[in-house]
């Protein structure tokens, strides 16, 4: 039975990073004893709630099961607190769509090779791309001076040149990924930490 004495979980939210998602919430305070939690999900227009593999768990989070890995699905989640025969009201999340609601991290810079007039940069995307993904890498770069001028370029390959540079000069760059999503918009990732490399002497 639903109990007015057992409050529903608060701060219920989906945390999603690089398409790895979990439901989390704040612990429900009780005077004595322990509380467990049960979480459900439903997708799209279906009215049926399904278990997430988190029934009567003491944890205050629940990872998405594999069937919820579809990026374009609209998902609603709910969680309640339970204590013995008592259950709280359900607390619901707003609709979640991974393709627009996830946070993309920075790409990984694997290698940088310096020549006199360019830097050859090798990167990896922050998540495992799916077939058909269109990814771009936005590169901001600048000479490491007191008043630098930032330049930008956009690349679709994971190996690219930053060109037209001066020899034996320190240049810095930061890279962020853009994923083209269904609506034609781009989901922008977090920029990588700036790193600096000196071009070679000719």
Predicted regions and their residues:
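N-terminal Sec-dependent signal peptide, specifically the hydrophobic helical h-region
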Residues: 1-11, 34-44, 49
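Extracellular fibronectin type III
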Residues: 84-104, 180-202
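Conserved aromatic anchor
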Residues: 19-31, 64, 112-134
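Structural signature of extracellular immunoglobulin-like
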Residues: 24-28, 37-42, 74-84, 122-128, ...
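Proline-enriched interdomain boundary motifs that mark the N-terminal boundary
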Residues: 4-13, 102-112
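Beta-strand-rich modules
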Residues: 57, 61-90, 160-185
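Short beta-strand segments within Ig-like beta-sandwich modules, predominantly Fibronectin type-III
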Residues: 17, 52-60, 149-157, 188
């Amino acid at each position: 039975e639903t109990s007015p004495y057992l409050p529903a979980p608060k701060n219920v939210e989906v945390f999603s990073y690089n398409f790895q998602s979990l439901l989390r919430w704040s612990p429900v305070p009780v005077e004595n004893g322990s509380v467990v939690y049960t979480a459900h999900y439903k997708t799209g227009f279906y009215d049926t709630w399904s278990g997430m593999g988190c029934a009567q768990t003491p944890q205050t989070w629940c990872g998405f099961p594999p069937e919820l890995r579809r990026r374009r699905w609209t998902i609603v989640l709910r969680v309640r607190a339970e204590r013995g025969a008592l259950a709280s009201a359900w607390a619901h999340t707003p609709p979640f769509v991974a393709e627009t609601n996830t946070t993309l991290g920075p790409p990984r810079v694997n290698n940088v090779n310096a020549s006199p007039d360019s830097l050859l940069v090798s990167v990896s995307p922050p998540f495992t791309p799916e077939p058909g993904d269109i990814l771009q890498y936005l590169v901001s770069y600048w000479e490491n001076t007191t008043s630098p001028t930032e330049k930008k370029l956009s690349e679709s390959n994971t190996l690219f040149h930053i060109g037209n540079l001066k020899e034996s000069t320190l240049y810095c760059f930061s890279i962020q990924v853009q994923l083209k999503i269904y609506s034609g918009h781009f989901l922008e990732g977090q920029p990588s930490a700036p790193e600096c490399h000196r071009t070679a002497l000719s």
